[in-house]
Amino acid sequence: MLKQKLFKFKPNKFIANYFFFCLFFFTFFASGMVDSQDGFQYLAITRRMYYDHTFELPVKKPPHNVHMNIFPGKDGKIYSPTGLGYSLAFLPAVMFEDLFLKLSGREPLATFPLESDWPVLLVASMTNAFFGAILVVTLYQYLKSFNINHKRSLLLSFIAMVSTNLFVYTKHVYPHMMFVSFLTLAFYLLRQYSLKKQKKHLFFSGLAYGVVIITYNPTFVLPALPFALYYLLLTKVKFNLKKIKSNIKILKQIIIDAFYGFLGILPFWLIYSCFNTVRFGNATSAGYGSSAGTKLPLIPPPYVIIEGIWGVLFSPGRSIFIYTPLLLMLFLFWWKLKKRLIPEIISFSLLSLIYVLMIGINRGAEDFLAWHGEVSWGNRYMIVIIPFLFILIANIYQTLSKYNKYFAFLPLVLIGLYVQSLGILFPYQIKRGALPNDIYINEDSLNFGEYPNFIPRYSAVFKMSKVLFKRLKNIKNIYDHGDYNLKLYDGYDSPFDLGWTKWRGTMPTAHISFDNNKKDKIHDLTLQFRNHQLIPSSTYSAQISFNLNDQNLDQSTIIIPADKDQEAKLQFSTDILKDQNNILKVDTNYIGTSSAQLKKKQTIFLQIIRINGLAQNINTLDYPYVSPISESLYGTEYHYWGNEEQNLWEIWNVHSRVFEETFDLWWLRPLHYWDFPKDVFSVLFTLNIIGIVFFGNKIWIHILFKAKTE
């Protein structure tokens, strides 16, 4: 009895523990970078609101800014057609950035997002973990409302996230996770009203739908009809033509209920209207469709409809069943759905039908079909229907035999986990890597955003699976600095893969660091280079000179003719070597020209580094991020990137190399960017692990105790 009192199950406390466990769990997989143009655009607006108190987009224009979707406002200034809600969600990220800016005495970056520092990107990349956690606990509560027991609701709500296409959107910086989490909450609160008959649930349902309205774009109208129908089906409204008084009473009740819901929606509708009026002079205009160009017909051509709907459902590259295999349970066991689920079956089916039709026929331009969700992992536009269809799947699961669970449900869960792990571990952008820009079928041109969706060998899951196995095979080369802790930490391009070996492109000034191993001290250091011709007409010889620990090694200077390889055996006294952090500076110039680089003509490759006759690994990725905050707070000094080379696009390209060629996890970033503050990241990583373990343990205790008492 005493034990039961001490461990009394408290639903609200459990929900809080479950929320924080999911928050820390999803945060663990965050990127540490903003990985979408949409995300940068929303974040740019947040920074403008916070620092400059305006909705106007940054005035900096290309080439010093990343391209954004812009539209002229009523005042002639440029604005984004994006929603306000997701920009407000980035306020913690900008406040975190502002804290570091004040500590470092720096002004906010003017050319954001091209020049963006790590604090704001780190926290921004974790934003959707918060909304993912909201969605999980909402699904848990939703499932319990169908009398699915605590343990099973817990298991299924978590599976609903990690084995479906929802998982990657707790990571990728798009507004869809915020949209779907509050939409699911709005539907759940309608169900709560039908069960408890408390008007407050209608009001809070309206509040949740109000958040949906301001989150993203005008697609908030798509769920409106299923939302209203769900209310009518849940409340079992039945009009009788012969009973006028009864009909009036029912209609009066509907109006009263609608009023409570409208009270919740109203403040957000006013915010939405004011936001649009300030920008575009019209309360209902969000900027979409106001740009110049050919006006698209209301009804698209038949090929658009057929191709889009088929693509959403069955294409090898973007089928919703490939990215969320669990949806197949609805086709395998639809006959197990109970009659009591009629409100959910009808409303959720209508919602799915609307999205399949509307997304399937969606066109961004006359020759651009956008049904596939554009640049994303899976179809981001279609994730809205996943939580609702999963509620039906969870009810089916209740009726399954052990055989069906092990041989149907479980395999689909595992396949889904694998597919989502590809989108979690790697940036989704690299699925297009090494693909030709266009292919031609007769007179039709298909770009790399189209044909991989229809040809299986180029599909994202197939292509990224090959990347996974290759990356795992090569993982030692990415992180192993060897016995001498060798790092090509500045002025070297990413490894150029020739198949049998990899070379490193060398900038005009490059730096290598290494330690002097106590067991096998360095007495011989040799570097081999190639002066590679990119075009035959460029025939400049290259001179390479060396400086070790601030001492010039004049006798080691070499001159390499065009299209030749040559070794440089460094001549130095072992007395100048330190036990740790020896710095070798490599200077390159071309004889007969004042150009430090001959882009698209010639390049210098480092082929091999040998220490004491043994080849060393030169494939680790060690770069400066070029962080003004780190420079001020930690006294970081930059040599090539951030000093000699300050072109923002060149530095952006450095970030892109690390982003594309490493595992996409925030806590791995300091292993590649040596100017990231390792103490800050270590503390955050430790807190992340502690959060997962602490709240995971709380949940485990709840499960054990609940299992004994049920």
Task: Cite the ranges covered by each PLM segment.
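Basic, ligand-binding patches in group-transfer machinery
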Residues: 475-679
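Membrane-proximal envelope and lipid/glycan-remodeling enzymes
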Residues: 2-499, 544, 625-710
